[in-house]
Amino acid sequence: MRSKIWLATAAVVTVAVATSAVAIAADTQVNTYKVEGSIKGGKGATAKAPKPVAVEFNYYVGEKNGLRPSPVTDYSILFGGLKVNTSDFPGCDVDKLTAAGDPSVCPKGSIMGSGRVINEVGQPSNLNDKSLYCYLELTTINSTKKNHFLLFLKGVQSAPDPKKTCVTQVAEPIDAKFVKRNGGTSLDFTVPQNLLHPASLDNAVTNVQSKLKNQSKKSKGKKVSFFESTSCKSTQKISVTFTQESDGSKQTASTPTKCTK
């Protein structure tokens, strides 16, 4: 009899532990990442004879168990084989842009590209909650500060296309920085808390698309471009390192790129 009671108790404990483990797993966000991208131009470029390029890249953020992804606090986007020439182009003052809330205050020639950011938004206490949505227009702008790059985000609560609305109004820049790395240049930035948690919600990026145009001009008697290729190795990549807010973990996803004519 005692043996039967012990076995029954053990079975209940086992089920309880297993159920608890499943619940913990379901409440733990494990982000997944995918990067796509391409370089247009740059074929035959060298460090002594760089060539102008345009850059396109997209990245996707998912969640392993179908939950809302964890917000990502920090990004480091490495462009293999590329350099930037921020000082040769007009720049926009970040304080002036922040106050105006619109890139129209920026000087001609300072806007370097455009894109979009799509987000899933929900209650922090419910990781299954994806009931809210935020579409942000992205405008990339050269800064007045050397090697700084402004990522201006615009979101509206009302628009003719419901897929281009955001749960909150957004009109502000993220001040990113270009950093010279071994084999290329990275664009590094931290997302402000008010964008990670608008109205005390969790805002999780799920897709970013960005196009950085081939912008060139004459400087000191020679033609320079904002983005230039300095090499065309077959091993070059666009890589993105993501820092997940929920546990501070870092993951890197990449895609190979090759120069074109």
Model-derived regions, located:
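Bacterial N-terminal signal peptides that target proteins for export
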Residues: M1-A10
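Bacterial N-terminal signal peptides
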Residues: T9-A18
